Amino acid sequence: MAIKVSENGRLFTLQTKDSSYQMFADDKNVLLHLYYGEKIGEENLSGLIFCTDMGFAGNPEEAGPNRKYSLDTLPQEIPGSGVGDFRDDMIEIRHADGSFAADFRFDSFEILDHSYAIPGMPALYDTEEEKGETLVITMTEKASDIVLKLFYGVFEKENVITRAARLENHGETAIELEKMLSFSMDLMYENYEMIYFSGRHAMERTAERIPVQHAKVEIGSTRGTSSHHYNPAVILCEEGAGETHGSCIGACLVYSGNFVAAAQKDQKNQTRFQMGIHPTNFCFHLEKGEAFDTPQAILSYSGTGLTKLSQQYHEIIREHICRGAYKHAKRPILINNWEATYFNFNEEKILKIAEQAQKLGIEMLVLDDGWFGKREDDNSGLGDWFVNEKKMNGSMAQLAEKIHKMGMKFGLWFEPEMISEDSDLYRAHPDWAFAIPGRVPNHSRNQLVLDMTREDVREYLLERLTTIVHDAKIDYVKWDMNRSVCDVYSHMAAQNRNGELYHRYVLGVYDLLERFLAACPDLLLEGCSGGGGRYDAGMMYYSPQIWCSDNTDAINRLSIQYGSSFFYPISTVGSHVSVCPNHQTGRVTPFRTRGDVALAGSFGYEMDLNKISDEEKEMVKEQVAAMHTYYDLTHEGLYYRLTGLKKQDFMAWEFVAKDQSRALLTIVKTDAEGNMLPVHTKVCGLAENKLYRCSLDGEIRSGRTWNRAGLTLHQVLKEYESIRVEFTEVE
């Protein structure tokens, strides 16, 4: 059993292979956080807490004359609001009398021999290879009939602990839930730094690192999606922690909507670490008998640096989040027509692109935006999911049949959650779009957002999408979402329910995705939101790969894919070779480099292959062959970042087979200067006692030597040039 409980039922120790998490219900039934870190025994660590009178720290009634006991200074698992803890709370409730107070005390516990599910939301699931365990702790509100259930999931082998919570109103009167996070924990006696991932459209997930001090460090999104601007995954690490050393705690939210993640030192230098749904524009009305569930947060600990932490997240997301026919099945190498044609295409152009792609070994053609309704630009047509047969010279089934006869798969782009005002759908159902009565709604990309909280909207979309997919025998769908969500108002919701709409929007999207995939179980679904605007574990539950960024510039992609790698498996990274000069940056990079960067992901092309040179066509063949050669390495192997946050003149990364029989190391020169110095890089992950041959010069060394001495290139890489180096076990 990974969940250990003391004889008196008040000390809880969660054990994974390499980590321990401990909490304790004290004699006043306050649930205290004691420890999360390197694996230890089951001894009670409550002695680590030092209570002292800090002044102006309130004392609950149970403390009696003891001024040292205060919720304002204790390390808690579930800090409430309005009852004496003045730090950031985890939960805020407004009662029927207008008061706001949340003071939850320990009541009971239950242990389940399986992982827990969350109604209507994605969460880690059990497999035949590993089942999780669950601890459910029931808390009761001190002065009302409100019950809080805390869920702790343990995946022992992957060193993962999950957190989620469920609030149930058992009282006679309604309450307003104004804030409820997925987890809070108070960490004692350490100085931490936070690593988070910021960005913007076409430049997502830039890794940044700052110390956690008494001023709060907070990131989040109120855009209706997890967003390009911050990712719902952060790391707390000890000062100076690196790839192979130092304690690190990761937190990844399995959610695709508004979120917040924060860390702050308190007056005792304890660090309060929290994550969950953002409280801005959030208010859930709960009548008697109603409940609210938070999204799941995935926690993981590494005592040996960031690399191990990332590998633990890669494994848990790949094996216990990603699902469906393509969870492990080999995914086709694709070509997408978007940057080749934009909206200016017809059947003839698409078939010519497909014919050339097929000759070069590419396995699937994806037809992007512009095939439906009145859609010659981005100003009209969204919502009218009917094939423009005039533009396509026939039905989609006819085009798909021609592609299939070439021996290729065929994919199609959709943007189901959006609607254009210039569309038949909007003219028939203007109330289906989010818009506040009496206000002109904001436009973004000249489109509005459909009210995904409505069942009739989802039914329409499900019918349209499944009909097209089935009729044309579509193999792949790219599911896009090209704006942020605002002007939120539903004609189907009561006024006291409008604070629920941002969350119910996400639940509506999840519901549609679940039903769509159930109707099309063999489909490969790739997520997208203007690239990486919804690149999160919630969407990976439905789409095992996500278009990582609309920026296809190979050099910018180094930073984007570097940041993505801290939490998300390389198999989830949609990455393509595109034309040069690049359409986003104007940069010119070697064709080989573009391929090497795209190989660190779910590989494809974004160009008209009829317009490239014969030499480049040969490179396409080589890259396609390389993708097949290295597929198992890049999609299932262990990933190592060999260069870091500090500025260097090259970037390097490595994949190592799980059996350590081979490895692939890639180097890209990012900067050049006169009289250049040689490139020397680390090598990681090779078996200490095995011998490996290097593909550069045939030199054979032990894994121990390669791991410690590294590799020096004896050739000068010019700016933006790249090289792949393979290490193969010698029997």
Please identify what each model-predicted range represents.
Residues 70-115, 243-257, 300-325, 362-367, ...:
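Glycine-rich, aromatic-flanked loop segments that form ligand/cofactor-binding clefts
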Residues 671-731:
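C-terminal beta-sandwich/jelly-roll accessory domains of carbohydrate-active enzymes
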Residues 243, 644-687:
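Carbohydrate-binding surface patches
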Residues 18, 165, 289, 335, ...:
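Conserved, mostly hydrophobic/aromatic
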Residues 393-395, 429, 433-590, 602, ...:
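Active-site neighborhood of glycoside hydrolase catalytic domains
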Residues 326-463, 476:
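Aromatic-lined carbohydrate-binding/catalytic grooves of carbohydrate-active enzymes
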Residues 100-106, 284-303, 720-728:
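Short Pro-Gly-centered flexible turn/kink motifs
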